[in-house]
Amino acid sequence: INDDLAEPRTNEYARADKAAAWMLKSKLLINSKVYTGIDRSADALIAVNQVIGSGYKIAQIPFANLFKADNNTNGAQEEIIFPIAFDGDKSKTWGGTTYLIHASCDNPTGITLGIDFGWQGYRVRKEFVESVGNSDPRIMYVPGNNDPESISDYTKFAQGKKLTKFSNNSFHST
């Protein structure tokens, strides 16, 4: 399949290139011993070094911009090796990031994330909050969320901390 793929960073956005294949290969190889009993970590290192040398790099943008609607133009495309694009025009679904955005919030928060309403779904437990603390800038808590960190009743959305990793807003509109 490698011969049929475009060179890294030469394909149109959201189309797999050789770096995507190398990344997948490295992940399979690093886990080979678990599934086959054969240690292929040396082969995984070769594949991941191909990815590292492919031209993709850590984007020099705020971490949250990796998860916004315009991550194909806001600098995130420097880092994202194989995105799955949902643009709302050519690809519509109730899958993709729809659940991830809607379930993370209630209605007032949903509006700030560029959606019409929230589903009041998932939240994180106290143990997660304690493991990362409040100082890690990659953890995006819902602003103003003063709900208790402990969850005693999993049917109550007002318990546990809410995270908002994904947003339907673009970097330039927020």
Regions found by a protein language model. Name each.
Residues 1-4, 12-52, 82, 136, ...:
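Extended, hydrophobic/aromatic-rich amphipathic alpha-helical segments that build helical scaffolds
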